[in-house]
């Protein structure tokens, strides 16, 4: 995240949940600059909650850096209900719709879509 106060709020929530700070790595920077530099297969959980127009690129990076059995969580996957409305054809909505369709057909991940709130897409990377 680019916002230091959001990172601090996340750290506080993790401590409150009993998760040791050493178990989490938070990186400040734009996803487009940071993700390409991250090591393959090194993370248990990757949260994609960034520039919606580039969601597919970020998920691809997320799957690359997630270990086998790791999860990529995609926030706002339903885009305020726009994904379910076939009349909505803007670039962002179409990207999320394509992402959901693609991962549903993929053998590389086990996917689950929660329709609660604005939607959360969970992609668990299958072992190789």
Identify the residue ranges that each predicted region occupies.
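S-adenosylmethionine/decaboxylated-SAM
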Residues: 1-128
């Amino acid at each position: 995240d680019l916002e230091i106060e959001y990172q601090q709020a996340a750290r506080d929530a993790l401590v409150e949940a009993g998760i040791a700070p050493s178990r989490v790595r938070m990186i400040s920077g734009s996803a487009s600059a940071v993700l390409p530099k991250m090591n393959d297969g090194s993370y248990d959980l990757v949260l994609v909650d960034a520039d919606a127009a580039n969601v597919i690129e970020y998920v691809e990076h997320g799957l690359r850096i997630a270990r086998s059995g790791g999860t990529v969580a995609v926030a706002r996957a339903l885009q305020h209900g726009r994904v379910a409305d076939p009349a909505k054809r803007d670039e962002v909505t179409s990207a999320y719709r394509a992402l959901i369709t693609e991962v549903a057909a993929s053998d590389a991940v086990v996917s689950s879509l929660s329709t609660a709130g604005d939607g959360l897409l969970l992609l668990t990377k299958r072992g190789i």
